[in-house]
């Protein structure tokens, strides 16, 4: 795992999927996510042959619970990953399309650097960021 961590830092684009234990996967995914700028930017999906579970990559963040300052992007992208998995698993193209639209909305929000949460250098709340993402999504539909 130590060599893998070094390679992630040096050349993260060489990786697509890493198969490892839960503990090492948690460590490596946190490392990779921090390279993007924040734990709040990565989606997380645990998927098997028949079941999948989406969750925020950063965990529950109980230290900021109820303060309206958490970055919602991780959970939103996790939900998009679940829609994509379900769409492909059940051959429902609209679910895959919805996933792609959510991804595009997040990309636009980050490109415009509007309505960012504190972890990304902004001042927006969780609710404000989510509302802005919804508005972007509405314009893409």
Features from the language model and the residues they span:
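Short acidic loop-to-helix transition motifs that present clustered carboxylates
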Residues: 1-6
């Amino acid at each position: 795992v130590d060599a893998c961590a070094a390679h992630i830092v040096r050349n993260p684009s060489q990786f697509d999927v890493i198969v490892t234990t839960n503990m090492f996967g948690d460590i490596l995914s946190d490392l990779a996510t921090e390279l993007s700028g924040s734990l709040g930017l990565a989606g997380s999906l645990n998927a098997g042959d028949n079941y999948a579970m989406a969750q925020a990559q950063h965990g529950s963040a109980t230290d900021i619970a109820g303060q309206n300052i958490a970055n919602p992007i991780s959970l939103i992208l996790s939900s998009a990953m679940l829609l994509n998995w379900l769409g492909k698993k059940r051959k429902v193209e609209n679910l895959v399309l919805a996933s792609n639209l959510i991804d595009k909305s997040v990309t636009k929000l980050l490109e415009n650097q509007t309505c960012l949460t504190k972890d990304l250098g902004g001042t927006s709340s969780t609710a404000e960021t989510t509302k802005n993402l919804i508005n972007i999504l509405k314009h893409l539909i």
